[in-house]
Amino acid sequence: LNMNLVFRLIWIVIKCLSRPVARNPKLPSRLNFRVMPTDCDLNMHMTNARYFSFMDLGRVDVMLKTAIRHGFFKERWGPMIGTSFIRFRRALPPFTKFQLVSDIIDHDDKWIYMEQRIEVQGELYAVAYFKGLFRAPDGNVESHRVMQKLNRSELVESRTELPTVFYQMEKVSRQIQ
């Protein structure tokens, strides 16, 4: 684990835990970062793996600033990613300021669906979609319990139709097995 990421993680944890749980969390969550030379590959742009690492930080931010953190700490929920898909649109050179935008799109009985975007001055540089869940010591946590902790009434009841990208992502992931 890169020390650069450890310091960023520590900063997010301190920032989130020093504040009370958001009663009505503002999602999407927005985090600002800068590409450091240690985030870059030989082509002198942010390495592909680092996008996923930053997105991990975004999901930690969503979890810790909301009441999901009570499930994480008190009920020992562990976040798990089932499927991820990313589309790179533009390269991020060193020292570029960017914003990571993380949002929960929907859920079904088991899975929670997220979209995360990396933007520079509002312009899309990468977009990723994740299907994940929380696992407790006694098994998977039903997604509606997670949504209740978010206190977002529009997401407590799952929609009947997910955005098309999630169906396509699932179809591709099943072909890879």
What annotation goes with each model-predicted range?
Residues 45-48, 82, 105, 160:
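Generic detection of intrinsically disordered/low-complexity segments and helix-coil linkers/edges
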